[in-house]
């Protein structure tokens, strides 16, 4: 668990300090260029350790929104580490980026997943159920992969 930008903004809205989640105060507090920036850079464990931990817990390691956090340059390394899939269809990726990620996933035999990036009441934009769904064939591949992992675990 942690405290994120959205939680701080929620508290500021509740206290009547601002009425806008993503307005001027948000920019002052969370824009790296702002002199009033309160962001503390977190320290993370390495990608390989994360993938190993997910696999150790019986999970499927999927790289979420690869373009949003500039993860694309590391894809070949993540494949070497054993990543299982890539979030191809998501609001933060353009159609061209989605095509590139789908091609990459297929050429490296990775699962191709869709996700809404829905963060509840903290979303900046409107995302409807099904807007970024995983196509049926790719969903079946995910389901089959999950079944294979369960059988392997027994």
Predicted features, each with a name:
Residues 1-62:
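Conserved acidic, metal-coordinating active-site core of Asp-based
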Residues 48-52, 56-60, 67-154:
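Charged catalytic cores and adjacent phosphate/nucleic-acid-binding surfaces used
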């Amino acid at each position: 668990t942690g405290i994120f930008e959205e939680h701080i903004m929620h508290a500021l809205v509740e206290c009547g300090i601002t009425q806008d989640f993503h307005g001027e105060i948000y920019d002052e507090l969370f824009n790296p260029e702002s002199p009033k920036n309160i962001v503390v850079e977190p320290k993370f464990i390495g990608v390989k350790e994360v993938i190993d931990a997910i696999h150790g817990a019986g999970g499927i390691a999927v790289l979420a929104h690869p373009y949003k956090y500039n993860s694309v340059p590391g894809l070949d390394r993540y494949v070497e580490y054993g990543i299982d899939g890539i979030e191809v269809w998501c609001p933060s990726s353009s159609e061209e980026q989605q095509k590139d990620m789908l091609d990459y996933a297929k050429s490296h035999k990775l699962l191709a997943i869709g996700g809404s990036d829905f963060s509840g009441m903290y979303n900046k934009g409107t995302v409807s159920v099904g807007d970024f769904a995983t196509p049926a064939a790719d969903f079946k591949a995910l389901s089959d992969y999950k079944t294979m992992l369960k059988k392997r675990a027994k």
